[in-house]
Amino acid sequence: FHSSLMKPAAEKLRVALAATVLAAPQIPVLNNVDVAVQQDADAIRDALYRQAFGPVRWVECVQALQARGITHLIECGPGKVLAGLVRRIDAELTGAALYDPATLNEVKELLA
């Protein structure tokens, strides 16, 4: 994943994205291919396409979020690798994983 081996799948993704109506984001969404916030639908489509085979710039993304004043990063989905990486990137940041009902309650308490 996130390698040139994904290029064929990325081309299929590009076709699907071209047929998808995207609304302007209501909140800033940072993409990991450019470490940038995109507002334009075509720029968002292009970033999503390139993210499929481009390198993940996780450290830079975390630093960019921190520069925007973000102190808590919540990883949603199976696993907790990214939450652990957040803490290793900067111990002042809080990283948490949300992947089941128990961790949902933990995240609610963390953000309360």
Regions found by a protein language model. Name each.
Residues 106-111:
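Cysteine-dependent PTP/DSP-like catalytic domain, specifically the C-terminal lobe
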Residues 1-76, 80-82, 105:
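Acyltransferase
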Residues 82-105:
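Short acidic, glycine/proline-enriched helix-loop-strand junctions
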Residues 8-13, 91-93, 112:
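Short, hinge-like loop/turn segments at secondary-structure boundaries
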